[in-house]
Amino acid sequence: MAGFLTIGKLTQVGGTAQDLMLGTNATLTFNAGTVLNGNVTATTGRLYFNGATFNGKLTAIKTGPGSDESNGGNVFNNIVDITNASNGAIILYQNFDDLFNNDVLLSNTSSGQILTGQLTGTATLAATRIISVGASGFASGALSIGRLTQIGSTAQNFVLGSSASLTFGVGNTFNGTVSSTSGRLYLNGTTFNDSFTAVKTGFGSDASNGGNTYNGPTEITLASAGIMYLYHYSDDAFNDDLLFNNTSTGQILMGQFTGNAVLAAGRVIEVGAGGFTNGMLNIGRFTQIGPTPQNLVLGNGAALAFGTGSVFNGNVISSSGSLFYHGTTFNGTVRSTKNGPGNDTSRGGNIFNGHTDITMTATGSMNLYSTANDIYNADLRLSNTSVGQFRLGNPVAGSQLKLLFHAVLIAPVHVYVV
């Protein structure tokens, strides 16, 4: 069956179930002024929701290609269960506001997308209700949630497959705890008012725009060889503790472009219970408010980088296999241990305003400030409990060591001072 079926300004009296079965080349539209009091089941190639009220359960399946942009303006008073069974896109509440007064279940059985709130439309999820993946699963494709406000504190849980991507988009507000698992993960402008726990299980480099506010504890786990970029373009605010885990070999990179982040006073950034055995953690453009001590303990196979534009106002302790200083200001003491055998070359450009104590416990080397000047405004102590080497400066780049007090070098250590 092909063609168009548009239902508008229709009021159903009574609760008889309605079943609308159209072909993959057909289009079904629920238009403004329609009120359906019974359960509605629909299967169609293309699907639009443009201002209807559903008082019974809605079950809808899109089977055809194409991007279907629903205007919005709908009221859903019962469960909504929408499945994308195509490589096309379902776009909900694009221009006007939707109201979800019951659970919202979204599934994808093909490679298509379900996108919500991508333009000016918004949505409200009623108190005690959830938005989640439906019984058919979300093994691949993309789910993007935008401009959705959750009323109340009901926990939300999103479980997608390792080939699927999940985006928390612009204008969302979640008032309950949020947990998610997905192959790819993007954080692009959402406010989380309770705890947020996320796991990335798939490959690929995921660059989150940023612009998020985290008012509860945040715990992010990388369980793949992929890359997670946080606050790449816009600023994030972490108003509670920030925990990172890496259970594979991937990288978590923060503030690598124009975005910045602020960690609230009294809060910590540290490794979570899942550990950070391998891979990389790069902390860039990150400002800690207040003097709370920070402790970053990574495994011997993991790399830790203190990146450009970061400011730590508390004492910092770190342990990692590889260690890099790429342009951070430390206003407290620094005590770092390198436990891995690699040759680590730091760019430099750091300011150490407190006592700095760096220890190597393995073979390999550490080259400090290779391309930009470091400033040490308190004692520098270098220790070596193995046979590795410290190299201070790079004569080719013309860098220098500036000591306003003095350096203490503990044997046995091979040190080159330029």
Segments predicted by a language model, with ranges:
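Extracellular beta-strand-rich, repetitive "passenger/adhesive" scaffolds
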Residues: 1-75, 81-351, 355-418
